[in-house]
Amino acid sequence: MAKQGSKEKKGYPELKEVIKATCKIRVGPGKETLTEGNCLWALKTIDFIFEDLKTEPWTITKMYTVWDRLKGLTPEETSKREFASLQATLACIMCSQMGMKPETVQAAKGIISMKEGLHENKEAKGEKVEQLYPNLEKHREVYPIVNLQAGGRSWKAVESVVFQQLQTVAMQHGLVSEDFERQLAYYATTWTSKDILEVLAMMPGNRAQKELIQGKLNEEAERWVRQNPPGPNVLTVDQIMGVGQTNQQASQANMDQARQICLQWVITALRSVRHMSHRPGNPMLVKQKNTESYEDFIARLLEAIDAEPVTDPIKTYLKVTLSYTNASTDCQKQMDRTLGTRVQQATVEEKMQACRDVGSEGFKMQLLAQALRPQGKAGQKGVNQKCYNCGKPGHLARQCRQGIICHHCGKRGHMQKDCRQKKQQGNNRRGPRVVPSAPPML
């Protein structure tokens, strides 16, 4: 079937690159990827099911139409597995057509379902607004900003599913990765400046990278001030960044240029930090080696940071942060013990003072002693429990010697059976008391 379809339609030449990208998507984590035959099977099957769409080119609009029609079909019991495979393969092709790169088939289905939910919410909202504004179709709708007939706009917060999708991409690929940049550029075109910066601040990522991104944004703002002197029709940095504006004010038409500039600044900052991360000598890649002293590591780190083309406050932040996060495990533990909760804010000099003995013979002996020290419930039981008789820790009440009087000698501190003045009589049931002592010197 695949060979025949390829001959008839020449392998869907308009989808050549899309199919090539789809073949990189895995069926599951650690499993095999989709093949060209899988894609051709799905496309040919769809053409067979929906013959009225067969002659139309495979655009994203046609794919969404097919997707909606497939949802309305109910397969037979014996065909449910093939039908699920058809939907999953189509979801992967749709993601590739939109430029997305999901790692697995399940991720592709999740992306399409998420976008479908956004589309349904948008349509539901449009039906309500259309009752008040019948000519709404003549105006362009910008989600979550909606142009209304009267000239104003309404604002809606970023959908949670979109935020979660961006969080997932940031955790899997990194905050400055191309995948995150592509996703942010796709969704943020209709966000206010406040939305863009707030979402970026709440994304998971390296603290040093976030500080570098903020530094790049400050550089873009300074460049804007130099190149655009204040004037009646000139946007200010505060307007571009959404400072001092409500969400309703930021969503108005006069702020469209400001939103576009803010998004461009963020994209430029992400790309700059990404290029910096892959450049040789990147400070974030300078980490302490197992056999390297902390002083030598700090010397390499400071040299790399000083060579970076960033401002002095960012250099100071990188020195304070990376001197802890990029240190070895032993040095981090030593800094935690010495500096406590202020370890992240401590200066480099304080951290060097705390780690001066790491790697020495005395430090190694200390680690060995800690490793050999008894732990667990058995080792803590005698230390934590207190005697109910005398109130002192280290023994139980039945083991307490305080207040005990020997009935043989009349002295305190031991019982009659343990009395040393008592003569041994015959073979006792318990035998003679054994007193620990060192072996004799031979």
Curated annotation (Swiss-Prot):
Region (Disordered) location: 420-442
Extent of motif PTAP/PSAP motif: 436-439
Keyword terms of this UniProt record: Capsid protein, Host-virus interaction, Metal-binding, Repeat, Viral budding, Viral budding via the host ESCRT complexes, Viral release from host cell, Virion, Zinc, Zinc-finger
SMART domains: ZnF_C2HC
Chain ranges passing through the membrane: none
Gene3D superfamilies the UniProt entry points to: 1.10.1200.30, Human Immunodeficiency Virus Type 1 Capsid Protein (1.10.375.10), Zinc finger, CCHC-type (4.10.60.10)
GO cellular component: viral capsid
GO MF annotation, one: nucleic acid binding
GO biological process, one term: viral budding via host ESCRT complex
UniProt-listed Pfam families: Gag_p24 (PF00607), Gag_p24_C (PF19317), zf-CCHC (PF00098)
Zinc fingers (CCHC-type), renumbered ranges: 385-402, 404-421
Sites annotated Cleavage: F363, K364
Domain note: Late-budding domains (L domains) are short sequence motifs essential for viral particle budding. They recruit proteins of the host ESCRT machinery (Endosomal Sorting Complex Required for Transport) or ESCRT-associated proteins. Nucleocapsid protein p14 contains one L domain: a PTAP/PSAP motif, which interacts with the UEV domain of TSG101.
Family to which the UniProt record says this protein belongs: Belongs to the Ovine/caprine lentivirus group gag polyprotein family.
PANTHER family: ENDOGENOUS RETROVIRUS GROUP K MEMBER 24 GAG POLYPROTEIN-RELATED (PTHR40389:SF2)
UniProt name for this protein: Gag polyprotein
Gene: gag
